[in-house]
Regions:
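Stable alpha-helical elements in mature extracytoplasmic
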Residues: 43, 47, 64, 136, ...
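Compact, glycine-rich, soluble single-domain proteins
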Residues: 53, 59-106, 124
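Bacterial N-terminal signal peptides that target proteins for export
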Residues: 2-10
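Terminal, regulation- and interaction-focused segments at domain boundaries
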Residues: 23-59
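Bacterial N-terminal signal peptides
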Residues: 11-19
Length: 153
């Protein structure tokens, strides 16, 4: 076996690994969380006000923690998922890219944890090829961050 034949398999393996690594998308963490200085109920009230002040309307609240408590786990930490919408922005989003409805960004969570009360959201992906979509995502992300900041001030 010649040196070239011996190096052929390792070269193919190394090349394949490098190609796989290069083709993977960047792992961006779009989850944003902040600690609230308020108790759970006050944080929820502050969030309701902040959402309204930023021209969004609450469309649904999923009180996950309360539901689990009602099923018998009385000490389960409280947690709520709040969905909200600005219909004008929703229309704009659908006109830019109708598939974005699958990534509806306007959700903020409030939960009790060992570290206190945590609020969180998932930001839209701004690293996209469509410049209109990227600008829209940046604007919505800015709103989400402002709503979260107003909640915990």
């Amino acid at each position: 076996m010649t040196i070239l034949e011996r190096l052929k398999i390792p070269a193919i393996v190394i090349s394949s690994v490098l190609i796989i690594i290069a083709c993977q998308s960047a792992n961006t963490n779009r989850i944003l969380e902040k600690n609230s200085p308020y108790n759970y109920q006050d944080t929820l009230l502050n969030l309701d006000i902040a959402i309204s002040e930023h021209n969004y309307r609450i469309i649904h609240k999923s009180e996950i923690g309360s539901a689990i408590r009602e099923r018998g786990d009385k000490s389960f930490p409280l947690s709520t998922v709040i969905s909200f919408c600005n219909i004008t922005y929703a229309k704009e989003m659908m006109l830019i890219n109708e598939q974005l409805i699958n990534d509806m960004p306007c959700i903020i969570t409030v939960r009790e944890s060992n570290n206190g009360v945590i609020i969180g959201t998932r930001l839209m992906d701004e690293n996209v090829s469509d410049k209109h979509e990227a600008r829209f995502a940046a604007r919505i992300n800015d709103d989400l961050k402002k709503i979260m900041e107003a909640t915990i001030l």
